[in-house]
């Protein structure tokens, strides 16, 4: 199959419309991270690239007759998902039934290997190359918040009831709780960024924003006025004080929970959970009906979610040193995880994720 590789801003208006139409036509591709607007936003944040390296879009069928699209960050020897590690989903957006060997895409990108870490289920071309999977949790409120709340309580989940109790308690003790959607407060945005950086410092994790482009990406999406794609800042104030905030990504009928934080001084009242509840109630008044929580085995995700999809990690590679090195790394990981070594068994997987994170931040 003919595959053209172009920079995101080189896509014609027709190609962008075609990409968006293919995504809209398939409910399984309902994610802002799979849209052409995501690829272009990441490209703007990263800045111009030279040569064959940088953010690229593989156009299956060619730019004159596009049948599918896959965005990737292309390096000297390997490629990664566009926007990694800031993207929560990856996948090929293509015509239904389109058959493609993903190794053709790897060859067209001019690399020896394409890694993925959150490949959506249903991506049949990539399924044989997956090395493992985990659930990614979703809240579907298409039937309205009241129906969702009833369903959760029937499932034996008390989280929403507990949030209501804490809301009444904080209003008695500290003052009114105020929810804002599409906040334009730069002060609140900056506070959310600081909360996130503080959390990374306290847990010994890498500050993703220190790489520069991830924070530029957040600022661009926060400032976006595009009705079809962009960021949305949700805030929750207790009295006059910002207690919790989320900068999420929106597209189609989905809001994807992305950057979240709260003031630890209000921990006893769970302001972050109150904010989730307010977002879900707000969805009754807007075209959005799905709050995507992403992957990660957190209690609040298990309790709030009423749907899930599988996301997989793995790689596609041909006969190359890059592919052989990755296969060897996964082999070591499998052996370690099969042994009863406790936390030591997880070290190879953690090392791989750490290296991928650093590669993505370049």
Question: Which positions does each model-derived feature cover?
Answer:
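Short loop segments at secondary-structure junctions
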Residues: 63-64, 96-97, 140-144, 239, ...
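Active-site/acyl-donor-binding loops of N-acyltransferases
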Residues: 2, 123-154, 252, 286-348, ...
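A conserved beta-strand-loop-helix scaffold within acyl/acetyltransferase catalytic domains
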Residues: 3-79, 119-136, 151-268
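Intrinsically disordered, low-complexity, positively biased terminal segments
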Residues: 89-125, 182-183, 204, 208, ...
């Amino acid at each position: 199959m003919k595959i053209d590789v172009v920079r995101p801003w080189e896509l014609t208006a027709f190609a962008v419309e075609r990409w968006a139409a293919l995504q809209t036509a398939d409910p399984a591709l309902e994610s802002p991270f799979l849209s052409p607007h995501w690829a272009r936003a990441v490209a703007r944040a990263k800045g111009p690239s030279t040569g064959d390296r940088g953010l690229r879009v593989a156009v299956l069928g060619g730019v004159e007759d596009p049948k599918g699209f896959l965005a990737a960050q292309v390096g000297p020897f390997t490629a990664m998902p566009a926007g990694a590690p800031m993207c929560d989903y990856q996948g090929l957006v293509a015509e239904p039934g389109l058959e493609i060997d993903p190794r053709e895409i790897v060859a067209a990108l001019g690399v020896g290997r394409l890694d993925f870490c959150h490949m959506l289920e249903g991506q049949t071309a990539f399924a044989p190359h997956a090395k493992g999977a985990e659930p990614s949790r979703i809240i579907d409120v298409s039937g309205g918040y009241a129906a969702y709340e009833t369903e959760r309580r029937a499932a034996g989940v008390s989280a929403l009831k507990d949030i209501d109790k804490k809301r009444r308690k904080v209003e008695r003790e500290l003052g009114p709780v105020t929810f804002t959607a599409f906040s334009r407060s730069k002060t609140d945005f900056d506070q959310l960024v600081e909360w996130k950086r503080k959390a990374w410092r306290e847990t010994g994790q890498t500050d993703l924003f220190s790489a520069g482009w991830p924070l530029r990406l957040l600022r661009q999406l926060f400032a976006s006025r595009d009705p079809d794609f962009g960021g949305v800042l949700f805030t929750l104030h207790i009295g006059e004080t910002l207690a919790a905030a989320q900068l999420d990504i929106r597209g189609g009928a989905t809001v994807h929970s992305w950057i979240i934080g709260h003031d630890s001084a209000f921990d006893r009242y769970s302001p972050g959970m109150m904010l989730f509840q307010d977002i879900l109630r707000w969805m009754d008044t807007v075209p959005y009906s799905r709050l995507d929580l992403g992957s990660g085995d957190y209690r609040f995700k298990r309790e709030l979610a009423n749907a899930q999809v599988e996301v997989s990690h793995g790689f596609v590679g041909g006969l190359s040193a890059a592919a052989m090195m990755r296969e060897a790394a996964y082999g070591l990981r499998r052996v370690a995880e099969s042994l009863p070594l406790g936390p030591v068994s997880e070290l190879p997987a953690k090392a791989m994720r750490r290296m991928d994170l650093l590669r993505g931040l370049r």
